[in-house]
Amino acid sequence: MTDYIKPYNNDPFVGHLATPINSSSLTRAYLSQLPIYRRGVSPFLRGLEIGMAHGYFLIGPFVQLGPLRNTDIKYLAGLLSAIGLIVILTLGMLLYGAVSFTNDSQDLESVDGWRQLASGFLLGAVGGAGFAYLLLTLFS
């Protein structure tokens, strides 16, 4: 075990965040397949894919745990609540991109890239939540 845990550059006074877990090739291969890190994909399509997954699973907690969970409109209330949260998340993404990046960068590391990512996220998340709503209403 002493072979794995060593000070960075054999200097115990230098901080380094690499561990055997987060610097392993398996972890790096897994993370490289996530949509945000995938090469050759436009920011809009990255946001669309991320949004579809998030919109699909955001409706469930609002349906099961929301204040209207014992009524006939629990699915509609869950859908509208999820869409409200999605809009708030999209505004947060837009603000983050506006204050963190400039327009002279490349691809996702620019204001325009984050604007595309956020618009794809909004479209995908509303679509994912709508798809989950349709499944819930059809199969319940």
Swiss-Prot record:
Gene Ontology CC: chloroplast thylakoid membrane; photosystem I reaction center
SUPFAM superfamilies for the chain: Photosystem I reaction center subunit XI, PsaL
Primary subcellular site in the record, as a coarse category: plastid
Protein name: Photosystem I reaction center subunit XI
Transmembrane segments: 48-68, 79-99, 119-139
Topology in membrane: Multi-pass membrane protein
Similarity remark: Belongs to the PsaL family.
Organism, scientific name: Cyanidioschyzon merolae (strain NIES-3377 / 10D) (Unicellular red alga)
Swiss-Prot/TrEMBL keywords: Chloroplast, Membrane, Photosynthesis, Photosystem I, Plastid, Thylakoid, Transmembrane, Transmembrane helix
Subcellular location: Plastid, Chloroplast thylakoid membrane
GO terms classed as biological process: photosynthesis
InterPro entries in alphabetical order: PSI_PsaL, PSI_PsaL_sf, PSI_suXI
